[in-house]
Amino acid sequence: MIKLKNISKIFDVAGKKLNALDNVSLDIPKGDICGVIGASGAGKSTLIRCVNLLERPTSGSVFVDGQDLTQLSEAQLIAERRNIGMIFQHFNLLSSRTVYENVALPLTLEHMAKEKIHEKVTALLALVGLTDKKDVYPANLSGGQKQRVAIARALASDPKVLLCDEATSALDPATTQSILKLLKEINRTLGITILLITHEMDVVKNICDQVAVIDKGQLIEQGSVSEIFSNPKTELAQEFIRSTFQANLPEEYLAKLTDTPKRSDSYPIIRFEFTGRSVDAPLLSQTSRKFNVSFNILVSQIDYAGGTKFGFTIAEVEGDEDSITQAKIYLMESNVRVEVLGYVD
């Protein structure tokens, strides 16, 4: 449904060339939800704005439903954009118009008959759960309600694609979850392909089928959510996955943690990351028996993404130095990521 082919975007900033996107290619099948994740300034917003040509690529092609938008005339592009809805971090509602009037605006601009507008807007407000707010002005809505109005307005032209530019970034966690649930419902019931950009891996984990990781204008990793979460290949992807966990050590351990062992009886605090089959295997107990080491678990958590289970454990590991080294090697050979956080006495 969406295919980006060798997209590059160069900006001229104070006489200098800035490569915002560098030879980016991305293919999103019809009906999928794809998340593009990256840090601030990575090129996420530029990428999504290239899909509907709000930003015209310096080079490359943008296909939506088989149509190369970069080859269209201005009039043809305007017509094709009706198939592409878009919502933003900031809701961009007209403060002088009611909820009903904001949703009806694109239909009014198309000179649709009032009866059809009423039918369409009523159905959309029901879909986003705002039937009782139709006569309310934006100033009297919560952030989540404003985003629901924006979603309804974006759906007014029956788009095939919905672009979401940091659509939940300004919302609290509970409201974020409700908006993500709504987007998932829209995807399932209407069959709309969704491309969203975010800096939060939790968003990807909750609703996406695919994920692409962008860094400094380049897509450095992409695949299904289950593939990326079970076997992240880049350090940045690993960092984003790690951010979904509440992985804080107890204060009493943080206070005495050192980078190197201070005494011969110091022992390491180690973080173990499990994905795929390694999550269900009793690897720590096997390792304990095999190498005569003990694991005192301090923090542990398991989660799911794309049907794949993954998790981590932070433990203090006791045993002689050689046994601990062999235990670490054994676990790494069993597809467990091992990271020594420090040492305690």
UniProtKB/Swiss-Prot annotation:
EC number: 7.4.2.11
EC main group: translocase
Any one cellular-component term (Gene Ontology): Gram-negative-bacterium-type cell wall
Family: Belongs to the ABC transporter superfamily. Methionine importer (TC 3.A.1.24) family.
Subunit structure: The complex is composed of two ATP-binding proteins (MetN), two transmembrane proteins (MetI) and a solute-binding protein (MetQ).
Annotated PANTHER family: AMINO ACID IMPORT ATP-BINDING PROTEIN (PTHR43166), METHIONINE IMPORT ATP-BINDING PROTEIN METN (PTHR43166:SF30)
Function of the protein: Part of the ABC transporter complex MetNIQ involved in methionine import. Responsible for energy coupling to the transport system.
This protein's name: Methionine import ATP-binding protein MetN
